[in-house]
Curated annotation (Swiss-Prot):
The gene is Ascl1. GO terms for biological process: adrenal chromaffin cell differentiation; carotid body glomus cell differentiation; cell maturation; cellular response to magnetism; central nervous system neuron development; cerebral cortex development; cerebral cortex GABAergic interneuron differentiation; commitment of neuronal cell to specific neuron type in forebrain. Its main location: nucleus. It comes from Mus musculus. Residues 39-51 have a biased composition (Low complexity). Transcription factor that plays a key role in neuronal differentiation: acts as a pioneer transcription factor, accessing closed chromatin to allow other factors to bind and activate neural pathways. Directly binds the E box motif (5'-CANNTG-3') on promoters and promotes transcription of neuronal genes. The combination of three transcription factors, ASCL1, POU3F2/BRN2 and MYT1L, is sufficient to reprogram fibroblasts and other somatic cells into induced neuronal (iN) cells in vitro. The keyword Transcription regulation applies. The lineage of its organism: Eukaryota, Metazoa, Chordata, Craniata, Vertebrata. Disruption phenotype: Lethality at birth caused by severe defects in neurogenesis. While the brain and spinal cord of the mutants appear normal, their olfactory epithelium and sympathetic, parasympathetic and enteric ganglia are severely affected. In the olfactory epithelium, neuronal progenitors die at an early stage, whereas the non-neuronal supporting cells are present. In sympathetic ganglia, the development of neuronal precursors is arrested, preventing the generation of sympathetic neurons, without affecting glial precursor cells. This is Achaete-scute homolog 1.
Amino acid sequence: MESSGKMESGAGQQPQPPQPFLPPAACFFATAAAAAAAAAAAAQSAQQQQPQAPPQQAPQLSPVADSQPSGGGHKSAAKQVKRQRSSSPELMRCKRRLNFSGFGYSLPQQQPAAVARRNERERNRVKLVNLGFATLREHVPNGAANKKMSKVETLRSAVEYIRALQQLLDEHDAVSAAFQAGVLSPTISPNYSNDLNSMAGSPVSSYSSDEGSYDPLSPEEQELLDFTNWF
């Protein structure tokens, strides 16, 4: 009876499942390393199958932007650096090489040495011409007082002045030639100079008082007599 009761109680109880086997720590880390290696190999094969994209170029930064320091306290230093870079000869040469024809204007080209020398000679010539006209203006009548005379007026006044001087020289030469030829020689009369002065001072009275003693003067002698009144 007791054995049959034990068999019934044992049949009524369910059998327990076997407990899982727990591996040691070394086996766990080896399994994790193998799984990581398999994942890396799968990722590498996937990258090889995908088309390779072109490498992206790094953005180029201008030297002016790189040289500017950050912060509000360094703004003055940044402005000075930018001003120095803008006035550097290398940057100016780069600006000259730029083509601005598409914008409707162009930068002035640097003149060659021959053109610079020619311009310098032209400036010196104009300066000398102006100095010459200033000197001529001082020698013509009323030229020193009128400093606003134009070049044309200065030349015209100089021509008139030269003609007047030439006329005086011609008349003086004519008088000298007449004296040398004996037409107005002082040996004609011992009191020639006194008579000439008296005729120059009062010709009407001398003619009226001594009409019988003097012959009428020729037109040439009368012209010479008028010339002596200038002195």
